Amino acid sequence: MRVSSASSTPPPPAFAAAAWAVVLLAMLRSDVALAAAASSNDDTGLSPLMPPPPLAAPVPAAVSPAPATPPAVLSPRKLLRPQGADVVGVGFVSGSGGGGGGDGVRTRRVDDGCAGADDIAIYQGRATPLPSGVPAYTVDVMNRCAGGGGGDEECAIAGIHVRCGWFSSVSLVDPRVFRRLGHDDCLLNDGRPLLAGETVSFEYTNSFPYKLSVSVATCVVDPAAP
């Protein structure tokens, strides 16, 4: 009887292929582990990037306070004016210039008597407009001289000239009361004197009011003289 030895029998092909597959898988896993270890060693000691510190906010420059505006100084002199009227212009003290000086001119304090143009006040207000709608204005010119003991004659003021621009009126203004002689020069009361407290009034119509102010006024010693 013939007996065969088991050790001499070669392994089947499927078993050999499986064995080689196991060996290759083990080698592949070993290579992956080594690569991971090397990558971990390369990253060791590196710190993550830190963002830059925030910039400090700019400090605004100090602003010096604005100087305080001094209060306006009001004149102690009060004006006597009709109720409901607006002061448009008050004359200035006139001397020998402007075509109004000459004999009889006296520049004095108001308490002592006539002060010339400084005693003439012009009040202007609105009046009833024309039927066509053109605005109307009323003007009152008053001699405010208080007198110095010599009576109304001491406060007589004549030759009153008014700054009036290119004054004109749609309605007629009595030229004996107020008329324009030239540009910015109008004559009041035909040049005749106003006594203390006297008022001359007139009315004019235009699309806008004129700014009126006294330019020249003359104190007269004897208002009855021609």
Swiss-Prot record:
Source organism superkingdom: Eukaryota
Pfam entry (one): TPD1_C
Keywords: Differentiation, Signal
Tissues in which the UniProt entry reports expression: Expressed in roots, and anthers and ovules during meiosis.
Consequence of gene disruption: Male-sterile phenotype due to the absence of tapetal cells in the developing anthers.
Signal peptide stretch: 1-35
Any one Gene Ontology BP term: microsporogenesis
Function field: Involved in cell specification during anther development. Required for the differentiation of primary parietal cells into secondary parietal cells in anthers. May serve as an extracellular ligand for the MSP1 receptor kinase to limit sporocyte number in ovules.
Subunit structure: Interacts with MSP1.
Name of the molecule in the record: TPD1 protein homolog 1A
Organism the protein comes from: Oryza sativa subsp. japonica (Rice)
UniProt gene name: TDL1A
